[in-house]
Amino acid sequence: GGAFAYVGAMQDSFPHALELSKKGYNAFALIYRPGAQTACEDLARAIRFIFDHAGELEVDTDCYSLWGGSAGARMAAWLGSYGAEAFGGGNLPRPGAVIMQYTGLSEYSESDPPTYACVGDRDGIANWRVMQARLEAMQQAGIDTEFHVYSGLGHGFGLGTGTSAEGWINDAVA
């Protein structure tokens, strides 16, 4: 996250990657350049790097997922919709799932992967109704979705520890 102006890695990326790693998943946190286009290009290049070095990194690239909060959620969704090739990453498989937190993104494509999304009901930046409408439209297009709104939470709740969102990451990986 960070509105494409800065990278909120300490709140979202690093804690999420660490938690996923504890659950036995390979996880990478990306520090990207500001700006929507350049951030997506950086994500596409990172995916390309992981695919090109999968053996060396000892990772399985089958059915990978993209995770992001706020601006990072948009990046994950756009790569899910348009693929890495649209952002200079070459012809790679699209993610098997997108996990997104607190973003007001409404656009989607009928080729989007299954999507899990969550947001707080007091988010002054990302209106939960926009996320809900997006996921409902995706469901109507035949895309599997799961959506959660957490009571009393604003923008940027991260892992949700000690809040109504605690444990959301377990739902997302289930």
Name each model feature, range by range.
Residues 139-174:
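C-terminal catalytic histidine-bearing segment of alpha/beta-hydrolase fold enzymes
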Residues 117-119, 123:
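Short beta-strand/loop motif that positions the catalytic acidic residue
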Residues 21-31, 65, 97, 144-146:
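A fold-wide structural signal in alpha/beta-hydrolase
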Residues 1-5, 70, 121:
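Active-site glycine-rich loops that stabilize anionic/oxyanionic intermediates
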Residues 8-12, 28-61, 161-165:
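Catalytic nucleophile-loop/oxyanion-hole region of alpha/beta-hydrolase
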Residues 9-28, 135-136:
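Short amphipathic alpha-helix adjacent to the substrate-entry channel of hydrolases
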Residues 113, 127-137:
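Short alpha-helix in the alpha/beta-hydrolase fold that links the catalytic acid
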Residues 41-112:
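Primarily recognizes the serine-hydrolase "nucleophile elbow" in alpha/beta-hydrolase
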